A protein has these predicted regions:
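FKBP-type peptidyl-prolyl cis-trans isomerases
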Residues: 1-290
Length: 290
């Protein structure tokens, strides 16, 4: 900082101190120290975070050490259950239940249209997730909920609607919406980690050629260019790995699962290329490269 009337480096200390903004200086110093020692702590403890750090400053001031606590989420340990067995059991049970429902409906002259005797993809994913043992880091759930809330706010703004109006229309409080998002986040994260572990356990692999073929099949002229981006390529790869796992399970179950036409499969591939990779997928890519 330069003080008027004094050459650089020759101004009295008391005048220099008066010209400075203490809050601004402290903020810059804290930011610099956190950035330096946070990275060092990760390397020293061999930690690979999958979330942004939650920083708490516990000591900072003149003539005292700078101390802070950084809380991060790491990939949880996942113990898979016998999901193929539980999926088969659920599929058999659903077929038996549907048979009874159809018999009852026929006797009562009701429609059979809404009675389904096949497992659907989301039910298979639920079984894989629910049969697994894992503990999802609270900080990761909070981060996911914050992302859902931000997305909701953006959607309301695009409709020229305030959040208060949305809440009144839904007859809900912000806390209730956040509670619903918390349940959704826990469910989605559980499924994500369980599927990733199942893919790893079954040694499912996706080649570069398969990723390129997916890009071509999407019908998007920009798709081949998009997969040159490492994050997009990793995201598409993860979608194809999941599809391979589910296809393998469906083939084993035979007629106990709902049919998926080639048209729907191509649609899913196209969507995988059009969707923007999430923060998690980018972090996972960094982790994979370590």
């Amino acid at each position: 900082t330069e003080i008027k009337g004094f050459r650089k480096g020759n101004a009295p200390v008391d005048l220099v101190e008066k010209s400075l903004n203490p809050t601004e200086i402290n903020t810059k110093v804290i930011q610099s120290l956190v950035e330096k020692y946070y990275v060092e702590a990760l390397k020293e403890n061999k930690i690979s975070p999958i979330s942004n750090p939650k920083i708490e400053i516990t000591a900072f001031g003149e003539h005292q050490d700078f101390v802070f606590v950084a809380t991060v989420a790491v990939r949880p340990d996942v113990k898979l259950g016998d999901y193929r067995k539980s999926i088969k059991t659920k599929a058999d049970q659903k077929k038996q239940d549907a048979k009874k429902q159809k018999e009852t409906a026929l006797k009562e002259g009701k429609s059979l249209e809404n009675i389904h005797d096949h497992l659907h993809t989301h039910e298979i994913i639920d079984e894989i997730a629910n049969s697994a043992e894992l503990e999802i880091p609270e900080i990761l759930i909070e981060e996911e909920v914050d992302r859902y809330m931000a997305r909701l706010v953006d959607q309301m703004q695009s409709l020229d609607m305030k959040m208060e109006q949305y809440l009144r229309a839904q007859n809900k409080t912000a806390e209730q919406v956040r509670g619903e998002f918390t349940e959704m986040a826990e469910r989605n994260l559980r499924a994500e980690f369980a599927l990733a572990e199942a893919i790893k356990a079954e040694k499912i692999e996706v080649t570069d050629a398969e990723i390129e073929e997916t890009a071509k099949a999407s019908g998007d002229p920009q798709a081949l260019e998009n997969i040159k981006d490492p994050s997009t390529k990793y995201y598409v790869k993860s979608i194809l790995e999941k599809n391979k796992l589910l296809t393998s399970i469906m083939e084993e179950l035979g007629d106990l699962v709902a049919d998926h036409s080639e048209e729907n499969e191509n649609k899913e591939k196209k969507e995988s290329l059009e969707k923007k990779p999430t923060k998690e997928s980018k972090k996972d890519k960094k982790e994979e490269n370590k």
